[in-house]
Amino acid sequence: MTTAPPPLSVLLELTHRCPLACPYCSNPIALAALREEMDTAGWRSLLEQAAEMGVLQAHFSGGEPMLRKDLPELVAHARTLGLYSNLITSGVAGGEPMLDQLQAAGLEHVQLSVQDVDPAGADRIAGYRNSLPKKRDFAAAVRARGLPLTINAVLHRHNAERVPGMIALALEWQAERIEVAHTQYYGWGLRNRAALMPSREQLMATIDAVDTARRELGDSLAIDFVTPDYYARQPKPCMGGWGQRFVNISPRGDVLPCHAAETIEGMRFDNLRERALADIWNNGEAFVRFRGTAWMPEVCQGCPKREIDWGGCRCQALALSGNAATLDPVCERSPAHAQVRATAEREAAAPAPEFIYRRPERPAPATADTLE
């Protein structure tokens, strides 16, 4: 039995249910049904185990976490355990009554997704009518209650030109921080890659827009920026290194090293109903396999950045090369690197196909706001 340093944070994917249908969603293609979701007692136990391990942060996500009626109870439990609580939400479900309950429970931060600053573009991406006005009202409610607000803006070929507007929106909505992140091609994002891939020219324009805003705004707004891997020369340290800083809990209670880990066929993922979190973290097959550097191929073993990027993303290596145990093809040392760049350029230059919206296999009845 081994003991690894505890993760910094735990992501609780409470549900895969969501009013939105964003084509870049990082949720798996096989979405968990309501009947499969872990119950309140299971999530409370998870929080207790995380706190006992030394985890510092609990991020409540989904799907849409505000669809869980027990969310205030879970936030309150996290508070009692000394865990920092963060809500990651679409802002179109739950409304002010739920927000009041969450504030009373001790919620400490809200991250709100924004699909576009153009109302029609926002609705098209979200697959949901009137999404932007509802998000604006939710942001106002968050700030009226004194809660810190971060805007999460996901970029792709259809909205890359509107980065300045997204930053202006964050200021207007009194956010303290904005994360401007290009689509990461996992889950539904990978399925929709050809519909979402920006051109290199679009990428460079977003870099310039962020650099300009940082110079002009100084400390008045924190701006985080994430580039698309397909145009990079070096891989990013996925999740800060596999099994090192982050643990993801699926709605079913499966314990994952990252959002997309379930795409790796043949890997065994333990469930909280059957095994304790600390044991899974320290000794679970899924966490041990790619933790550290021993698993790395020879080309990575000799790289001075091996303990900086940790070989890149395992799920991306699988998706692009068919082998999760090889170096991330985004890396310029990979024999597949040129092919990755060529794929991005080819897809960005071609007409964008229609979105494949994030929908369960048996979608719930459409609401008046759902775009079909």
Curated annotation (Swiss-Prot):
CDD domains for this protein: Radical_SAM, SPASM_PqqE
Cofactor descriptive note: Binds 1 [4Fe-4S] cluster. The cluster is coordinated with 3 cysteines and an exchangeable S-adenosyl-L-methionine.
Pfam families: Radical_SAM, SPASM
Domain of life: Bacteria
Cofactor names: [4Fe-4S] cluster
Record-annotated Radical SAM core domain positions: 4-219
Gene Ontology MF term list: 4 iron, 4 sulfur cluster binding; cyclase activity; iron ion binding; oxidoreductase activity; S-adenosyl-L-methionine binding
Pathway: Cofactor biosynthesis; pyrroloquinoline quinone biosynthesis
Enzyme class of the recorded protein, top EC level: oxidoreductase
Keyword set includes Nucleotide-binding: no
Reaction(s) the record says it catalyses: [PQQ precursor protein] + S-adenosyl-L-methionine = E-Y cross-linked-[PQQ precursor protein] + 5'-deoxyadenosine + L-methionine + H(+)
GO biological process: pyrroloquinoline quinone biosynthetic process
Region (Disordered): 342-372
The protein's Enzyme Commission number: 1.21.98.4
Entry keywords, A to Z: 4Fe-4S, Iron, Iron-sulfur, Metal-binding, Oxidoreductase, PQQ biosynthesis, S-adenosyl-L-methionine
Family the UniProt entry places it in: Belongs to the radical SAM superfamily. PqqE family.
Subunit structure: Interacts with PqqD. The interaction is necessary for activity of PqqE.
Function of the protein: Catalyzes the cross-linking of a glutamate residue and a tyrosine residue in the PqqA protein as part of the biosynthesis of pyrroloquinoline quinone (PQQ).
Protein name: PqqA peptide cyclase
Source organism of the structure: Xanthomonas oryzae pv. oryzae (strain KACC10331 / KXO85)
Gene name of this polypeptide: pqqE
